[in-house]
């Protein structure tokens, strides 16, 4: 079913569409750097991926604290880190699929089947992280993933 808020190209196999404001928020993060993270959720009607929260914190721990312990979310974080070779700081956009073990099975299923439509719509993501518990999205784990080959960029 076509929804006037969303473009057909951002419809997932599950029938969940990416709301245009979700894409606009990402483009503002990517281009304007006004926010450092966006947390997305599937709305209660299970028809759209929408922005749940945007933040400007410099603290990765604050961002992690926004992820619910018992439900799924998508997120984008502007991950800034130091290059170990002394070349200074780098920043990479990281896409998170947060699907904790304690989330309801139905929620996990709809988030899994809707992820690709959002992920394809967000151009400029350098790293993708799947998290089922907080250890998988810990700063050190993400740093290891984003810094692979950082000296060659």
UniProtKB/Swiss-Prot annotation:
Sorted alphabetically, the Gene Ontology cellular component annotations on this record are:
actin cortical patch; actin cytoskeleton; cytoplasm; nuclear matrix
List GO BP terms, alphabetically. Answer: actin filament depolymerization; actin filament severing; cell division; endocytosis; Golgi to plasma membrane protein transport
Query: Can the keyword Glycoprotein be found in this entry's annotation?
Result: no
This protein's source sits in the domain of life called Eukaryota
Where does the UniProt annotation locate this protein? Cytoplasm; Cytoplasm, Cytoskeleton; Nucleus matrix
What main location does UniProt list?
A: cytoplasm
Which terms does the record give in the GO molecular function aspect? actin filament binding
State the UniProt keywords alphabetically: Actin-binding, Cell cycle, Cell division, Cytoplasm, Cytoskeleton, Nucleus
InterPro entries, alphabetically? ADF-H, ADF-H/Gelsolin-like_dom_sf, ADF/Cofilin
Q: Which Pfam families match?
A: Cofilin_ADF
All copies of the ADF-H domain together span 15-147
Membrane spanning stretches: none
Which SUPFAM superfamilies does the record cross-reference, listed alphabetically? Actin depolymerizing proteins
Function, as annotated? Controls reversibly actin polymerization and depolymerization in a pH-sensitive manner. It has the ability to bind G- and F-actin in a 1:1 ratio of cofilin to actin. Binding to F-actin is regulated by tropomyosin. It is the major component of intranuclear and cytoplasmic actin rods. Required for accumulation of actin at the cell division site via depolymerizing actin at the cell ends. In association with myosin II has a role in the assembly of the contractile ring via severing actin filaments. Involved in the maintenance of the contractile ring once formed.
Matching PANTHER family? COFILIN-RELATED (PTHR11913)
Record's family? Belongs to the actin-binding proteins ADF family.
Q: What is this protein called?
A: Cofilin
Which species is the source of this protein?
A: Yarrowia lipolytica (strain CLIB 122 / E 150)
Q: Which gene encodes it?
A: COF1
């Amino acid at each position: 079913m076509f929804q006037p808020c969303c473009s057909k190209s951002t419809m997932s196999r599950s029938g969940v569409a990416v709301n245009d404001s979700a894409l606009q928020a990402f483009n503002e993060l990517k281009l304007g750097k006004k926010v450092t993270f966006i947390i997305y959720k599937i709305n209660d009607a299970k028809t759209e991926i929408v922005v749940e929260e945007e933040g400007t914190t410099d603290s990765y721990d604050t961002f992690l604290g926004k992820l619910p312990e018992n439900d799924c979310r998508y997120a984008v974080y502007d991950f800034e880190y130091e290059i170990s070779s002394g070349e200074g700081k780098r920043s990479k956009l990281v896409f998170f699929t947060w699907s904790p073990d304690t989330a309801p099975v139905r929620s996990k299923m709809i988030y899994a089947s809707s992820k690709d439509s959002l992920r394809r719509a967000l151009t400029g993501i350098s790293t993708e992280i799947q998290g089922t518990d907080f250890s998988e999205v810990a700063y050190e784990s993400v740093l290891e993933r984003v810094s692979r080959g950082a000296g060659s960029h």
